[in-house]
């Protein structure tokens, strides 16, 4: 079994939405890269990242953050959120993602 810890990104922060409701957001104090490193230290090999800003607006806001996490955590990245085109897939792969999750709107 492979466990995929997940970090949802919004406004550059690690967050969690209650039942997908943007009005009910929990913000975590830990910087996303530090949180990813903590998952790696706990034995994770993969990390699932979701760009909630891109999921909502269709414009990626966290490519640079995805790249920093991919380069600095030692984890393989599965990324998604707002992926609507082949260009979006290519951009996430170029940022260091090993896998890209494409939503139904693609």
What would you call each of these model-derived segments?
Residues 1-75, 83-87:
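Conserved N-terminal beta1-alpha1 strand-loop-helix module at the mouth
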């Amino acid at each position: 079994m492979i466990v995929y810890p997940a970090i949802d990104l919004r406004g550059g922060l690690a967050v969690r939405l209650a039942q997908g409701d943007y009005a009910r957001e929990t913000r975590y104090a830990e910087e996303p890269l530090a949180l990813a490193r903590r998952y790696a230290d706990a034995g994770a090999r993969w990390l699932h990242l979701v760009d909630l800003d891109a999921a909502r607006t269709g414009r990626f806001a966290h490519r640079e953050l995805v790249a920093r996490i991919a380069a600095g955590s030692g984890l393989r990245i599965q990324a998604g959120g707002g992926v609507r085109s082949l260009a979006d897939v290519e951009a996430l792969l170029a940022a260091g993602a090993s896998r890209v999750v494409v939503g139904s709107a693609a």
